[in-house]
Amino acid sequence: MIHCYEDAIDNVVAHLKIEHDIDVVFEDEELGAYYHDAKIIGINTNETLQEQLYVLLHEAGHAILKIEHKKYLETCDETLQGKLSLLREEMEAWKEGKALADNMGIPINEGTWAVFCKQNLEDYIEWATS
């Protein structure tokens, strides 16, 4: 079992490179994002290590959805249907990220994870309902 955030981050980065040929970029101006065509995940180093890990797992979830499950490959438009599709993808990416952590033996504080997911999903919910 992995016990520190640096080790967990390093293991997820290695997993993404080995399994999916995805590079992870850590910069202070990066957005937490997965760039599918470029095969890059960006992580903002201004976040705490715990937040960086959680964002990395979430963005890995996007990669798993697109690469392994062949889901959400089309860009969503601004229609209600498109917004709901993006919201579904965001929720599924959090679930896939948690499953990846579990499979890799990365301990996740369930309460902190749930709050972090909720905070991040609220922006998408607000956008989708506007």
Task: Label each residue range with its predicted role.
Residues 50-51, 82:
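Alpha-helical hydrophobic/aromatic positions enriched in membrane-embedded helices and signal peptides
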